[in-house]
Curated annotation (Swiss-Prot):
Protein name per UniProt: Arginine--tRNA ligase
Source superkingdom: Bacteria
Organism of provenance: Borreliella afzelii (strain PKo) (Borrelia afzelii)
Lineage: Bacteria, Pseudomonadati, Spirochaetota, Spirochaetia, Spirochaetales
GO MF term set: arginine-tRNA ligase activity; ATP binding
Pfam families for this protein: Arg_tRNA_synt_N, DALR_1, tRNA-synt_1d
Chain ranges for the short sequence motif 'HIGH' region as given in the UniProt record: 127-137
ATP-binding in keyword set: yes
Amino acid sequence: MTKNVKKNIKDEINIIVTNLALSKNIKLDEININIQKPPKSDLGDISILIFELSKTLKLPIETISEEIIKALKAKYEIKAMGPYLNIKIPRKEYIHNTIQMVNAQKDTYGTSKYLDNKKIILEFSSPNTNKPLHVGHLRNDVIGESLSRILKAVGAKIIKLNLINDRGVHICKSMLAYKKFGNEITPEKAFKKGDHFIGDFYVQYNKYAQENENAEEEIQDLLLKWEQKDASTIELWKKLNNWAIEGIKETYKITNTSFDKIYLESEIFEIGKNVVLEGLEKGFCYKREDGAICIDLPLDSDEKTDTKVKQKVLIRSNGTSIYLTQDLGNIAVRIKEFNFEEMIYVVGSEQIQHFKNLFFVSEKLGISKNKKLFHLSHGMVNLVDGKMKSREGNVIDGDNLILDLMESILPEITQKIENKENAKKNALDIALGAIHYYLLKSAIHKDIVFNKKESLSFTGNSGPYIQYVGARINSILEKYNTLSIPIIKKINFELLEHEKEWDIIKIISELEENIIKAAKDLNPSILTSYSYSLAKHFSAYYQEVRVIDINNIDLTAARIEFLKAILQTIKNCMYLLNIPYMLKM
């Protein structure tokens, strides 16, 4: 049910309960009206749990139910069933209002001002410049991109940030391999995307390291040269990083992932040191005998030690900083630059402890005062035989996964579409729909095993199925537009009397509350489930009902408007889930 109908009923019951309390001289601190969906649709459209009101008022359930029924029976069909009141909404007016609202609001249907311009930073992706994005990155990216759209849809002001890790030991590994084996070759000459080109050298380094004991020493020498800003080392580093970043940005473009600002770690990693030194001056941290600057962290509940705290080094005795220190600097920069209210880090579950420590230290040093910091931890995406390892080259590569899915469905598409470029575009859209939906439909915290066959299903709980239903509805609307049927100026929505039409109207009207729930829970899977439910209900409806009937143009006109509302709702969901909408399939 729409928010307005629920709100109206809630307000009316609130007044009834308040008056009942006054008549019995009962003082009320708070009235909690619990609105639910009945377990079966034939029981009603809205269910009110009276048990909680009974506890609050200290009155029998029957007494409260009788008072509410007496006050509302003129407007609604309402029946008591144990501790519940089941209410049926007047259908005709509701169907008319819902369809007109959806078709008038179009792309904005389902949006709200729930978060009322709250300024939220979403940091996601954060790739390394030594390899291409793997499917784990694709999961991170689609979670970040989808959540940014969902939070915007409920009124938040979203800033999407990406911190690219372009320095450190892992970057030096690709650099060393290129110096030894690259022979001045370029991605263009090798006919490879820049990130894949660099990734090959990262894998090559690990093979080299297995056969050469001094490989680690060579890496440390190269890292020292970088830190000392050796000209030839910096030149090589910039060249390789540019190639990698160019390739990564191509993947972002393909997957419809964008950012408001991209930071390079090499440009800001020193800022954290100054933040820690300020903390040292204020007495928030301390200097150890060897010169290292430390802070005490609280112990986790499962840690056993003689002390109540554990020591955390923020700046090493040689003056270098750790990742946590660099992240402290990033928080300070973003507060100054954006003055956000909340910052959400979309990062894998392996970093839970890091963020726990980061948020504690940030608060203790007074950096993030009055700011909410949150780690949205997501599970891993695994191969059939376990977790991915890029150093061995045993990884589900993001670009190659997209290409693999495209190649799987291209033969079928080329049978329908002769133009090769159009066929490839359709194949890409279906591949992205398959991947994005599959990566979003599970609970974020869960590890998943990517199942190619399941992701590409045109009949199951999948992106291509949602895309197919959208394209099917569009083809019906296009067919209607080609027919010589008189235009009906005043649509008679009272003709929509089929039970499945009512079921679908109820689902359509719940879009806003589902978007709000997805935003509150930071959980796009709420919208994958919602989209699948709507698509399934339409498919069942279409099997039973003849939409276009030239012998009944009034009913046809009403059903066409009904289908427009279904399609608009599906399209709005697809946008929020970063799934391409397709006119034809």
